[in-house]
Amino acid sequence: MKLKPLNDRVLVKRLETEEKTAGGLYIPDTAKEKPSKGQVVAVGPGKVGDNGERTALAVKAGDEVLFNKYAGTEVKLDGVDHLVMREEDILAIID
């Protein structure tokens, strides 16, 4: 299935966290926090301003980003968890 975000929305695939701690202990799925780091899969065309002009987004497909813990709406595409969120919910682009 293909999903194309609208306006200032961004489709992000969560990046998985480590399965074990630095001390070698394995973390069960029930104890893991959902990661707030992901990779941008697709972006919308941008937000329409009051003047009617569309402003392009700062993020692009392939960017690795940090986002708010409770950002976006969860969707499952081809069995993989993704989030659809507004660009303003993205805190930073990781270089």
Curated annotation (Swiss-Prot):
Q: Which cysteines are joined by disulfide bonds?
A: none
Q: What's its job?
A: Together with the chaperonin GroEL, plays an essential role in assisting protein folding. The GroEL-GroES system forms a nano-cage that allows encapsulation of the non-native substrate proteins and provides a physical environment optimized to promote and accelerate protein folding. GroES binds to the apical surface of the GroEL ring, thereby capping the opening of the GroEL channel.
This protein's record includes keyword Plastid: no
Stated name of the protein: Co-chaperonin GroES
Q: Which PROSITE patterns does the entry mention? A: CHAPERONINS_CPN10
Keywords, A to Z? Chaperone, Cytoplasm
Q: Which GO terms describe its molecular function?
A: ATP binding; metal ion binding; protein folding chaperone; protein-folding chaperone binding; unfolded protein binding
One cellular component term from this protein's GO annotations in UniProt: cytoplasm
HAMAP family in the record? CH10
**One Pfam entry name:** Cpn10
User: Is Cytoplasm given among the entry's keywords?
Assistant: yes
Domain of life here? Bacteria
Q: Family, per the entry?
A: Belongs to the GroES chaperonin family.
Summarize subunit and interaction data from the UniProt record for this chain: Heptamer of 7 subunits arranged in a ring. Interacts with the chaperonin GroEL.
- Name where it's found: Cytoplasm
Task: List the GO biological process terms.
Answer: chaperone cofactor-dependent protein refolding
Q: Matching SMART domains, A to Z?
A: Cpn10
Task: Please give the organism.
Answer: Desulfovibrio desulfuricans (strain ATCC 27774 / DSM 6949 / MB)
